[in-house]
Regions:
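Primarily the internal scaffold of c-type cytochrome electron-transfer domains
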Residues: 2-167
Length: 167
């Protein structure tokens, strides 16, 4: 981006890379309640404010930057978007981010998924109550487990079997 806080906070900026079948974050965001609320209330978002604290400077809708980078009443602003992500869903079998960070030799390997999740929950609870947020994460983890059991593990087993079959 061109070092404009307004541009950096705009979901369209993130969506230039985070799009398509292999990582469709912008498509998911645009169709979500958060994305719809952002488009509806964009003029109330104070996107060019020097500080941008959820619940203080705006409360209409989160953007990618809100959840993954913005300051909260208890967390400083961060440029490390991985500090609030508790799953890495890029591999066939999703892993906790400290596992994938360790394989790549990244400093994030020192930060466990529970800390990252608590960082994100801190963001969420500026707009949602704690029960709602905890319920979301229960469903999210269950969905990861369901995907692994129903698709990823059987798919990997078939792939392994096909490699062993010489015909």
């Amino acid at each position: 981006h061109e070092f404009s806080v307004e541009q950096a906070r705009n979901p369209e900026n993130c969506g230039k890379c985070h799009m398509g079948p292999d990582h469709p974050q912008i498509e998911i965001y645009n169709e979500s309640k958060h994305g719809i609320a952002f488009r509806t209330h964009r003029d109330k978002m104070n996107m060019d404010s020097s500080k941008w604290v959820v619940g203080e400077d705006y409360s209409q809708a989160p953007t990618c930057a809100t959840c993954h980078m913005s300051q909260t009443p208890t967390q400083p602003l961060t440029h490390d978007v991985g500090l609030r992500i508790s799953w890495n869903k890029r591999p066939v079998l999703s892993v906790r981010p400290e596992v994938s960070d360790a394989k790549l030799g990244l400093p994030g390997a020192a930060i466990d998924w529970q800390t990252r999740r608590n960082n994100m929950k801190d963001v969420c609870t500026n707009c949602h109550n704690e029960n709602y947020v905890n319920g979301f994460y229960q469903q999210y983890d269950a969905l990861i487990d369901l995907y692994h059991d129903k698709f990823a593990k059987p798919g990997l087993a078939r792939l392994a079997a096909a490699r062993l079959d010489p015909h």
